[in-house]
């Protein structure tokens, strides 16, 4: 029997990464794993949620020494757009596992962008020594192939879930997150389209990670209210299963976060994506979702595509 350590963006109450952890833990349990340990920013909560071992993010060394396999992923761990320090951390976990002779599996990640030369060199070396590499999109596979690294192309882990397809008429979901270039002008233009198209429907504003999403969701609710739309609800404190349930109930979703759009696709909900990150653009291209840019001033064509 095999022992596993999982390295990911776990314990931050981010819906997408917690949903991935949920899928991954279930897969490892189904394989008959002897021991599963998640590296987490909130080990106590992680252990409670998943029923497995958990260690703090800066105290993973002993867990790696005792394990057989390190699983890195999923999500977008290996990129330096968020920060170079973040890339170094996740690579550091991989390098520790390699140093102690452990197998390393890269699990369905979106790789890049990695803009720094040092970051590219360190990532190439780490992945060339991994036992198995799988990625969640074609462009990540092409990047790794250009580095001489074989990578298996698989769906994002959320696509493995059997999600309900209720698609109730009359409910529109809007999922926003804070972002430096998400400004008042964009929110007002978005609100104008929603008022124009969906004034007869219930609007649900979905906060996936309250520390990042909630303030902008509440701000957008106020903007909609000023424009005369009062059938608006802000949903916060959502668990992974809450999100699956809420999105599957929707008729339409306007989604900013990558995994909001993934869940909509999997649940058969018509979605319009907001492009704040290259991973969202890749997903929209792959699944033919209408896509609006944060600098865009007219969304009528994209809303026509959503409704049509």
Regions found by a protein language model. Give the residues of each.
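Active-site anion-handling motifs in enzyme catalytic cores
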Residues: 1-308
